[in-house]
Amino acid sequence: MGRQFAGICGARGSLYGCVVCNTYLTCSKELTSKAFTGSTGPATLFKRAWNVVYGRCEHRKMTTGWHTVRDVFCVTCNQKLGWMYEMAVSESQTYKETQVIIENANFEKIAGAIKDPLGEDRQEAPPAPNLEMSRYPLEAEKKSRPQYRTVSVSSSSSAEC
């Protein structure tokens, strides 16, 4: 397997990271509910999480019934964070499918430690390109280029090669 890259994918609002290594996991815009309980105490349900690896599918009996879940681990430090719901047996619990539970003891708020790599958190407009400079070379560039001799070929005379 190639080298793993930990990054930020469309972060909006407050950022949350692994409590052990501070790797970005998700953001507040992905939050579905804080009213969950994990094996270590309170847990939070998120729509998506990044920089995680998933364990094998298992069938588990939970407080809301049987679910098919995968454990979720931090990609950097391999800390167990929680689990992802693959499938719910009960029709009333299907809203959890493909969402991730992260236990509150395993993540923390990251306060301004990570910038948005897409630059969408910038407030000012990007500078306008200087088209005049890009179309015409500078005098110094003209002198440093090799000069080629142009030969015009007319249709009436024979062309020399």
UniProtKB/Swiss-Prot annotation:
Protein's name in the database: Protein yippee-like B0546.4
Positions annotated to bind Zn(2+): 18, 21, 74, 77
Biased composition (Low complexity): 151-161
Superkingdom of source: Eukaryota
Gene Ontology, cellular component aspect: ubiquitin ligase complex
PANTHER family: PROTEIN YIPPEE-LIKE CG15309-RELATED
Keywords: Metal-binding, Zinc
GO molecular function ontology, one term from the record: metal ion binding
Species assigned in the record: Caenorhabditis elegans
Positions of the UniProt region annotated as Disordered: 117-161
Keyword Zinc: yes
Yippee domain residues: 14-111
Pfam families named among the record's database cross-references: Yippee-Mis18
Family the UniProt entry places it in: Belongs to the yippee family.
